[in-house]
């Protein structure tokens, strides 16, 4: 993170009044604050799990909702309970929101009884009750631009819109996910972009996160009502519930391919929380059953695929597994289109410029990363390479080395990140030998077997002296065996046994519409991935930006901890014990370095930077890598074992630290080693 000089900036703030806002943003959350973050207080008053937290706009009030069906409004700065009221719900409260521009007087709650209630805090009364949903209400969303309007997401698959100015006690359906995904789909979370209140993000069952343009949807419905043929429909002329261009989908590029494997292992993928960055340009998703992902909404990118420059300098120019030249990007977009008839190998374009040496301090970081790699400390190596990549984003060697570390660590999603790094390295240096070979291995591990074979053949053509190395031979045997296994499986299925992916189900319950398939195929990929936590047990687990400039990412975890990462490097910087069982909720204060958390314990915990004289060891998880490895095993464990673990039973191999030697990749790679350069 950038270095800070608070004395200098204080003087500048005194001299320049315009610098006050930038000062507040700069010192909202800093690296020293994160290092000193500790428990300040526990707010006691609930008698059940605390499932939701919400700050008011000024940050002097904090609302909480619980399994006890009560909501409490706190004065968090003085650790006082200001108000407690029974909400009228008959089941667990999952969401609580202050209505904007209402003087912190109106509070909205959604609960497992399928109801949405609106409360007037000044008189402690419920003034509106909506019962339109037919399943549990999981999230409420509000928008500053529309102070009388709010939205709800529920497990009936509906996104509903409410307008308190209308006398009707009913809401309207804004989005019906069952129209696209079948009756079994469940909406879990939603949020409105703070900078563009017409942009609504929705998380639901499955790996896809959806962005909708509310204004386009309303305009489309108005035009439909005004159309002379609005009431005349035939089977072939059914009106689309959403207009073209009103929805965009986002997904981690490797997840759609992994879905069959996850389903076989009863591993469920569901977006449990979505939120926008303060400037509205990024979308953060906590993917249940997987990791935390950040999507760039401005510079969107398609999921990565196999894109290699055709032309390369002679293999004689390759030294120590890399060239002494630095290639430029071939300018081809990274769309995930692995067609059955193969893939295009685009021509490399542009002048190949000399490889720029790393500055001495980055060379030291790279050397430290190489040493960590040699000691099989894969996560440490990845973090060091990531630190160097942030400072030298055009160095092909760093991407190639980090790819090797990802391939060795083999956490969920690591092979896809390695694929991305290999492609980046090749775009910077089209003759990066190791990146070419690792790319073939990544494609194989990601189940793109035919593409892996093509990639390996291309590698042998570019680097003929490596064609008969033991590494090439071993990978070739693996690919051949996988192809035979795949063909054998298809033959056993018999005619018609291998149904195409896009074959629509005849069952209304699980049918996916053609429009939905098109939107999924056009999905955008993530920019950053954050690993270490575990999100498999609850479907309300949050992840949030921390800091006015979104410098950090925070997330709860099934192990009772919450995790803090640097946003740009994705490096894990702190883990704190926040609950005896599970941390679900993390809500940062709007302007202070102040964090409210809650989970299974019936308390709200407040965290802020503590004095240097205070001992923080009681809540700090020192072995962050060990905790992360244990969570990776927990995510891949049998669901019954996870349930027993959460009940307090000790499962050998799950609750203990250490990576386990059985996960190590075969090290006999011959001449093309997976070690870093």
From Swiss-Prot:
TPR repeats lie at residues 362-395, 397-432. Signal peptide: none annotated. It comes from the Eukaryota. One of its GO terms (biological process) is glucose metabolic process. GO terms for cellular component: Cul4-RING E3 ubiquitin ligase complex; cytoplasm; cytosol; nucleoplasm. Pathway: Protein modification; protein ubiquitination. SMART domains: TPR, WD40. Keywords: Phosphoprotein, Repeat, TPR repeat, Ubl conjugation pathway, WD repeat. WD repeats lie at residues 45-84, 88-129, 132-172, 182-222, 265-305, 535-575, 578-617. The modification Phosphoserine is found at residues 353, 511. May function as a substrate receptor for CUL4-DDB1 E3 ubiquitin-protein ligase complex. PANTHER family: WD AND TETRATRICOPEPTIDE REPEATS PROTEIN 1, WD REPEAT DOMAIN-CONTAINING FAMILY. This is WD and tetratricopeptide repeats protein 1. It comes from Homo sapiens (Human). The lineage of its organism: Eukaryota, Metazoa, Chordata, Craniata, Vertebrata. The gene is WDTC1.
